[in-house]
């Protein structure tokens, strides 16, 4: 797709709802060019222009930038109707206070984003937040909004979570491959139901560190620590160990509500009678 022409005012029909620019498009979009019917806008790979205040219509709900986009988002440039915002690979700009509209519920940063996100930057209505491959900044307490339910970190993230960092609304937390920090008791919120560790996580799970709300726990490739009795919450129903796990399963270490248990390829231990809970319905060695 070679289209790379200025879009003239009035050239787009008033009923258009979805607009996708191809890879080559890299023109400033003047205010008043895009119709007020537009709900979904996608820029291609080469687009890297400042988004001028007033250039995006108040009807817009979904905005996706391509991999070259790396411009500061000015306060007032994104419409208050926007609910989903996706940045591409190259975006690595400071997120200015007031630049993200309060209507936003889903925010995805691309691989290169590696900026501190200060408290008050992310809108309160945000429910889903995804950081990309290279993000590795401390997340200050109070910087994640209180309505956040799903949080995903990329490959490079390896920071300690300070107390009060993760909001009590959080239900799903996914940590990237490089994360390998002890998770102290009180760090994870009691709302959390799904926790996924990445490839290199290999720390002892301390009793009381996993909340009683947790139902699904997945360990990554390298995890190979003894599971101490009382360290896994009774709410847990699904437990998955990764490739390297090869520890004796201690009596009383698996919760009584567990229904699905998966061991990795390296597991080769005798399982003593009474070790596996009677609630178990699916077992994979």
Spans of model-derived segments:
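A detector of long low-complexity, disordered segments enriched in serine/threonine/proline
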Residues: 1-2, 284-285
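Leucine-rich repeat
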Residues: 2-11, 24-31, 46-55, 68-77, ...
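Conserved hydrophobic beta-strand positions in leucine-rich repeat
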Residues: 19-21, 41-43, 63-65, 85-87, ...
């Amino acid at each position: 797709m070679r289209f790379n022409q200025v879009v003239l005012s009035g050239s787009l029909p008033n009923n258009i709802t979805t607009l996708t620019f191809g890879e080559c498009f890299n023109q400033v979009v003047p205010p008043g060019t895009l119709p007020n019917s537009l709900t979904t806008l996608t820029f291609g790979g080469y687009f890297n222009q400042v988004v001028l205040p007033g250039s995006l219509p108040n009807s817009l709900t979904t905005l996706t930038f391509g991999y070259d986009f790396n411009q500061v988002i000015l306060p007032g440039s994104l419409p208050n109707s926007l609910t989903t915002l996706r940045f591409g690979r190259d975006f690595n700009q400071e997120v200015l206070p007031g630049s993200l509209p309060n209507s936003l519920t889903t925010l995805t940063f691309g691989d290169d984003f590696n900026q501190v996100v200060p408290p008050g930057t992310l809108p309160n209505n945000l429910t889903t937040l995804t950081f990309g491959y290279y993000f590795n900044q401390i997340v200050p307490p109070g910087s994640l909004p209180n309505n956040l339910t799903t949080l995903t970190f990329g490959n490079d993230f390896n920071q300690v979570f300070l107390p009060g960092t993760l909001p009590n609304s959080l239900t799903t937390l996914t940590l990237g491959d490089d994360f390998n920090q002890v998770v102290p008791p009180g760090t994870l919120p009691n709302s959390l139901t799904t926790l996924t560790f990445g490839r290199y996580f290999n720390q002892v799970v301390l009793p009381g560190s996993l909340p009683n709300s947790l139902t699904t726990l997945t360990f990554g490739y390298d995890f190979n620590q003894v599971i101490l009795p009382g360290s896994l919450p009774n709410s847990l129903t699904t437990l998955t160990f990764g490739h390297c796990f090869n520890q004796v399963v201690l009596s009383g270490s698996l919760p009584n509500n567990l229904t699905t248990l998966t061991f990795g390829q390296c597991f080769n231990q005798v399982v003593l009678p009474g070790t596996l809970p009677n609630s178990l319905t699916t077992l994979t060695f």
